[in-house]
Amino acid sequence: MSTLLSILSVICSQAIAKAFPNLEDWAPEITPSTKEHFGHYQCNDAMKLARVLKKAPRAIAEAIVAELPQEPFSLIEIAGAGFINFTFSPVFLNQQLEHFKDALKLGFQVSQPKKIIIDFSSPNIAKDMHVGHLRSTIIGDSLARIFSYVGHDVLRLNHIGDWGTAFGMLITYLQENPCDYSDLEDLTSLYKKAYVCFTNDEEFKKRSQQNVVALQAKDPQAIAIWEKICETSEKAFQKIYDILDIVVEKRGESFYNPFLPEIIEDLEKKGLLTVSNDAKCVFHEAFSIPFMVQKSDGGYNYATTDLAAMRYRIEEDHADKIIIVTDLGQSLHFQLLEATAIAAGYLQPGIFSHVGFGLVLDPQGKKLKTRSGENVKLRELLDTAIEKAEEALREHRPELTDEAIQERAPVIGINAIKYSDLSSHRTSDYVFSFEKMLRFEGNTAMFLLYAYVRIQGIKRRLGISQLSLEGPPEIQEPAEELLALTLLRFPEALESTIKELCPHFLTDYLYNLTHKFNGFFRDSHIQDSPYAKSRLFLCALAEQVLATGMHLLGLKTLERL
């Protein structure tokens, strides 16, 4: 389905070409109107063309308008110096709603589906997932859902940190201090003890380094301990993924170990390596620091692994696009990785995107930590969110049974955390506040969920299980027109999210849609109205778009609150 924006862009492009035939390939810039009295969309190109054509903007606007067709508009007007405002006719909006109804079922499929790899979450073995993993996990999951929805083939990868010198240290400690480590909390505690030994005891450090060599040589005893450590950690990670409703395929750093020597050999053959302080590096003119791919002791590092992963994803997974979701602090590393992969011929420009994100802050504007200064454990944060949701339900809905509260609280709590994160621009830091994220008003998950529940209430009052999408609709009132227009902008929100890799475009859209639905609900009565069928059609579309949009954000719906 063509979006309203794309339809209008074609119409304006043709009008500009007719008005100014000597102007080559001018792409008009169309934007939604900032205020309702300016119509539905606005074209500001007359101001830009004034510099090119050496004419007054208003005269240019008048020339463009003279070439515009009457259909599908009810009003075209020139405002101010030369802004062209467009208002679509109710007949056209009704027709588009019929097309939209069908396209919504299919997912607004792209014409050329691609293989997309999204690398997200990526916790480290033997360590608790913390609040920093929250952003990577839910941003990556939302992007994966959206790319899949529009028809792309998405491979979700979890690049778990399951290799390196830290494992030699932990294996040594467990060999010398046998104990139970079937729980991640035990393992995390043991990791801290092992680190103290590694830091303060030179002999322990030597034995740890020997165990790294043993692990790389696939010594049976070292491998057995390593596998048990990984198994314990992954079970704990999966519990969190189950709570968050995350599906992701594990492919840890260790997967790429067999390819690391070949990477170094290939870079040497291509003349890309320079020895610096006994380490092998790739230097780039655009960067002040090199990309080190082999340490001075001959060992590999995460840069080597990331380069091998990039090559594998292109050559073996046949990815058309690779997206890695991590904090912004790793931006330079990924810029160097991309530059090196391009120089080595593994990657073409424009295929890789690093989706960086900002910090999660406490109410004082500092990085969210525990009182002891440690990272907040993600599992504890999620459990607290559910507890807070239970408290809110008991306060506002005292008539609910314990069973009803236990059913609804996890949905409300997890929705609140996800939406609070996704509604913030991903590159910005945001303040984590349970009090704000659980509000019924404002840009919150509860605000969206309440509108969805309202629609379920309409169905119960009418004694029906499903709203009819039998058309055609008949737009009569301003509130209906605003709701229809907003519904039709759903694919535009998806396009913006995909283009910028920022889920907040979708949250902003759903927040706006909820506002428009609430206005419609207030002003457009359904029962005993001659327009009941048409208004129920709009309710049905609003229900589907809200449910779909929330699903794409990883949120769940409820029939009742």
Swiss-Prot record:
Similarity comment: Belongs to the class-I aminoacyl-tRNA synthetase family.
Give the main localization category: cytoplasm
What InterPro entries would the database entry show? aa-tRNA-synth_I_CS, Arg-tRNA-ligase, Arg-tRNA-synth_N, Arg-tRNA-synth_N_sf, ArgRS_core, DALR_anticod-bd, Rossmann-like_a/b/a_fold, tRNAsynth_Ia_anticodon-bd
Q: Give one GO molecular function term.
A: arginine-tRNA ligase activity
As recorded in UniProt, its EC number(s) are 6.1.1.19
Per the record, what are the reactions this protein catalyses?
A: tRNA(Arg) + L-arginine + ATP = L-arginyl-tRNA(Arg) + AMP + diphosphate
- Motif 'HIGH' region: positions: 123-133
Family matches, as CDD domains: ArgRS_core
Per UniProt, what is the name of the gene that codes for the protein in this document? argS
Enumerate the Gene Ontology biological process terms: arginyl-tRNA aminoacylation
Where does the protein end up?
Cytoplasm
Complexes and interactors = Monomer.
Q: Per its record, how is this protein called by name?
A: Arginine--tRNA ligase
Q: Which organism is it from?
A: Chlamydia pneumoniae (Chlamydophila pneumoniae)
Cellular component terms per the entry's GO annotation: cytoplasm
Q: Which UniProt keywords apply?
A: Aminoacyl-tRNA synthetase, ATP-binding, Cytoplasm, Ligase, Nucleotide-binding, Protein biosynthesis
Cysteines engaged in disulfide bonds, as pairs: none
